[in-house]
Design a protein with these regions (language model features):
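Residues that act as N-cap/strand-start positions at coil-to-secondary-structure junctions
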Residues: 20-22, 108-110, 127
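Zn-dependent metallo-beta-lactamase
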Residues: 1-33, 181-182, 201-202
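Metallo-beta-lactamase
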Residues: 16-18, 34-36, 42, 123-202
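Conserved beta-strand termini and adjacent loop/short-helix elements that scaffold enzyme active sites
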Residues: 12, 83, 109-113, 123-125, ...
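Active-site HxH/HxHxD metal-binding segment of metal-dependent hydrolases
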Residues: 41-114
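Short hydrophobic/charged patches on amphipathic alpha-helices used for structural packing
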Residues: 25, 46-49, 176
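Conserved N-terminal boundary motif of the eukaryotic protein kinase catalytic domain
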Residues: 117-121
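Active-site beta-strand termini and strand-to-loop segments that position acidic
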Residues: 28-31, 116, 133-136
């Protein structure tokens, strides 16, 4: 079920029944503990997690990446971190309804100054409703970037139509400065391929 990406980093995925797009989740390990990023629920998941490390927290990169996050955090009895509404959403009322509807009230809203598990740092992606997370040499994003045939792509390139390239250009303009600032060497994404190394050289 788990696919190794790099030392102390694994991923697993499942197909979205509506879009046909594969949704990927990541497990990060540090000192015998495990943090789950945008986890999708699957049979046998809890047992597999505990073989690798003691679950400590679930972190969502954006609110639409609900997947199994509220359920998994509740059933494992671990903390759930969700993006701070005021930092990533334009309509606070709708976002609060979203949180209520999907049972995320117990989630801790995080922002750029939050002390996340494993020393993970969060960076708001301008114009996008998500955070880029930094874990060691890796940047983690939900939707904004991913690999396609070994090359770096920016949302929605390679997933949804973008005939003029204006949308992917806007995403790259927002994310590239963060990649450069953090010096991230690899990319972990919620879709398509991860980029284990050479991220800076792809800019």
């Amino acid at each position: 079920m788990f696919e190794p990406v790099a030392k102390n980093i694994f991923r697993w995925g499942t197909i979205d029944g509506e879009s046909g797009i594969i949704m990927y989740s990541h497990l990060l390990l540090k000192e015998g503990k495990a943090v789950l990023i945008d986890p999708v629920a699957m049979p046998g998941l809890y047992k597999m997690i505990k073989v690798l490390g003691e679950p400590e927290a679930v972190i969502m990169t954006n609110h639409p990446h609900i997947r199994g996050s509220p359920l998994i955090s509740s059933q494992l009895g671990i903390l759930l971190y969700i993006p701070d509404i005021k930092e990533v959403e334009e309509d606070e009322a709708i976002s609060n309804m979203f949180i209520d509807l999907y049972n995320m009230k117990h989630g801790i809203q995080y922002g750029g100054s939050t002390n996340l598990p494993f020393g993970i740092k969060a960076y708001k992606i301008p114009g996008r409703h998500e955070f880029a997370l930094i874990f060691g040499d890796f940047m983690i994003v939900g939707d904004s970037a991913y690999g396609v045939n070994g090359k770096l792509n920016f949302y929605p390139s390679g997933i949804w139509p973008d005939e003029t390239g204006s949308k992917s250009n806007a995403t790259s303009d927002a994310l590239i400065p963060i990649i450069k600032k953090t010096g991230a060497k690899g990319l972990l994404s919620g879709h398509n391929e991860d980029i284990p190394s050479g991220l800076q050289e792809m800019l």
